[in-house]
């Protein structure tokens, strides 16, 4: 096997795992993140002497690597091709950190960085294991208005989507901020097409005259709690109705006819005024036939 082949480097990598530094980093879905793997400041390296290898710790997936005189990255897994890069300028200074672009939920795992020196007989120069934690904000919970499948029970539904990691769901009695018994709720949590979590929680409680509860979606990694309340009163079951002033039907009809009568009277008055004005205008402007025909002068014959 050639000295500069990826296969040889993989064999060396599998046998050199002692004295590994451990680090943790957190990234949001869709963001870029740097996985640190660097020697002390002031270090200098020759890129024709060092071998650098990044892979996932558990599945041994090849993320990226640097081999002297070999620019091919054909062994890089397709999931990381064009997404995982090292800086040649940084490597000259001993910074072998990995830049990972467009983080996905599937990137949540441990990554191992190994640096070897050929001039030192492939001695390990640096070994770092970085645990990447991935997070995404859940949407603000939507709590449906309660409905009554029976006279003795109320049902609430709470929905939140596109979060990571898997959430915790709590229902809260907002009167005293106590947690409701989780036996009263039924949670459905599943991964959507984006690899993020959607959650639907259904709460069933005994019907009471007044209920003030809240649904809480907890993202442990982000230390984030999103809570939305839902309050009902004695008018449960009448929430879709609009309450008006108690005016009788007869009173409404009488008021309607009164308005119509006034409108009709106004129309009649307006028409009468119009006709009167028209007649007056005609009388003032008409001067008779003498006004429009010049007076004929009679001249007698001598």
Curated annotation (Swiss-Prot):
CDD domains: IgV_B7-H2. Residues 141-227 form the Ig-like C2-type domain. Glycans are attached at residues 70, 137, 173, 186, 225. One of its GO terms (biological process) is signal transduction. Residues 19-129 form the Ig-like V-type domain. Residues 19-256 are extracellular. Residues 1-18 form the signal peptide. The chain crosses the membrane at residues 257-277. GO terms for molecular function: identical protein binding; receptor ligand activity; signaling receptor binding. GO terms for cellular component: external side of plasma membrane; extracellular exosome; intracellular membrane-bounded organelle; membrane; plasma membrane. Expressed on peripheral blood B-cells and monocytes, as well as on monocyte-derived dendritic cells (at protein level). Interacts with CTLA4 (in vitro). Belongs to the immunoglobulin superfamily. BTN/MOG family. This is ICOS ligand. The lineage of its organism: Eukaryota, Metazoa, Chordata, Craniata, Vertebrata.
């Amino acid at each position: 096997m050639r000295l500069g082949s990826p296969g040889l480097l993989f064999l060396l990598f599998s046998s050199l795992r002692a004295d590994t530094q451990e680090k943790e980093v957190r990234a949001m879905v869709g963001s870029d993140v740097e996985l640190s793997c660097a020697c002390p400041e002031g270090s200098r390296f020759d890129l024709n002497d060092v071998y650098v290898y990044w892979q996932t710790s558990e599945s041994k997936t090849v993320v990226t690597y640097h081999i002297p005189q070999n620019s091919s990255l054909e062994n890089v897994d397709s999931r990381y091709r064009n997404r995982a890069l090292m800086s040649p300028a940084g490597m000259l200074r001993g910074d072998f950190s990995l830049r990972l672009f467009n983080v996905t939920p599937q990137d949540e795992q441990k990554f191992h960085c190994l640096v070897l020196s050929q001039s030192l007989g492939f001695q390990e120069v640096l070994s770092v294991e970085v645990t990447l934690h991935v997070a995404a904000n859940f949407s603000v919970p939507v709590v449906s208005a309660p409905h009554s499948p029976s006279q003795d029970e109320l049902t609430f539904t709470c929905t939140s989507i596109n979060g990571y990691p898997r959430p915790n769901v709590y229902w809260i009695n907002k009167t005293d901020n106590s947690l409701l018994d989780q036996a009263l709720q039924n949670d459905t949590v599943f991964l959507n097409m984006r690899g993020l979590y959607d959650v639907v929680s259904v709460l069933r409680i005994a019907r009471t005259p007044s209920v003030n509860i809240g649904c809480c979606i907890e993202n442990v990694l982000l230390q984030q709690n999103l809570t939305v309340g839902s309050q009902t009163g004695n008018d449960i079951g009448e929430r879709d109705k609009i309450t008006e002033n108690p005016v009788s039907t007869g009173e409404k009809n009488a008021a309607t006819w009164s308005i119509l009568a006034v409108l009709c009277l106004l129309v009649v008055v307006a028409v009468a005024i119009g006709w009167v004005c028209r007649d007056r205008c005609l009388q003032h402007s008409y001067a008779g036939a003498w006004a429009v025909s010049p007076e004929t002068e009679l001249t007698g014959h001598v």
